[in-house]
Curated annotation (Swiss-Prot):
<dbReference type="InterPro" id="IPR005685">
    <property type="entry name" value="IHF_beta"/>
</dbReference>
<keyword id="KW-0233">DNA recombination</keyword>
<keyword id="KW-0810">Translation regulation</keyword>
<dbReference type="GO" id="GO:0005694">
    <property type="term" value="C:chromosome"/>
</dbReference>
<dbReference type="InterPro" id="IPR020816">
    <property type="entry name" value="Histone-like_DNA-bd_CS"/>
</dbReference>
<dbReference type="GO" id="GO:0006310">
    <property type="term" value="P:DNA recombination"/>
</dbReference>
<dbReference type="GO" id="GO:0030527">
    <property type="term" value="F:structural constituent of chromatin"/>
</dbReference>
<dbReference type="GO" id="GO:0006355">
    <property type="term" value="P:regulation of DNA-templated transcription"/>
</dbReference>
<dbReference type="InterPro" id="IPR010992">
    <property type="entry name" value="IHF-like_DNA-bd_dom_sf"/>
</dbReference>
<dbReference type="GO" id="GO:0003677">
    <property type="term" value="F:DNA binding"/>
</dbReference>
<dbReference type="Pfam" id="PF00216">
    <property type="entry name" value="Bac_DNA_binding"/>
</dbReference>
<dbReference type="GO" id="GO:0005829">
    <property type="term" value="C:cytosol"/>
</dbReference>
<comment type="function">
    <text>This protein is one of the two subunits of integration host factor, a specific DNA-binding protein that functions in genetic recombination as well as in transcriptional and translational control.</text>
</comment>
<keyword id="KW-0804">Transcription</keyword>
<comment type="subunit">
    <text>Heterodimer of an alpha and a beta chain.</text>
</comment>
<dbReference type="InterPro" id="IPR000119">
    <property type="entry name" value="Hist_DNA-bd"/>
</dbReference>
<comment type="similarity">
    <text>Belongs to the bacterial histone-like protein family.</text>
</comment>
């Protein structure tokens, strides 16, 4: 599902909200979440899951075209851990 599809679904289910209001709310939420992660904060949405940063240590990689070894610096990457309610819902038999 894309962001536009999400906006469309919310507008369909919540008739009193305009598409512009929903779009602004989603963009604001995503921006705030991005800023929180960029400053090293953890985000927890109960029943859904949590977002945090995991550190990837420096390592030696390989250029797939040439086979040449390449040094890759350490970096932080976003990580999502689903909550129990989300895991249970995804694994429900249909």
């Amino acid at each position: 599902m894309t962001k536009s599809e999400l906006i469309e679904r919310i507008v369909t289910h919540q008739g009193q909200l305009s598409a512009k209001d929903v779009e602004l709310a989603i963009k604001t939420m995503l921006e705030q979440m991005s800023q929180a992660l960029a400053t090293g904060d953890r985000i927890e949405i109960r029943g859904f899951g949590s977002f945090s940063l995991h550190y990837r240590a420096p390592r030696v990689g390989r250029n797939p075209k040439t086979g040449e070894s390449v040094r890759l610096d350490g970096k932080f990457v976003p990580h999502f851990k689903p909550g129990k309610e989300l895991r249970d819902r995804v694994n429900e038999p249909e």
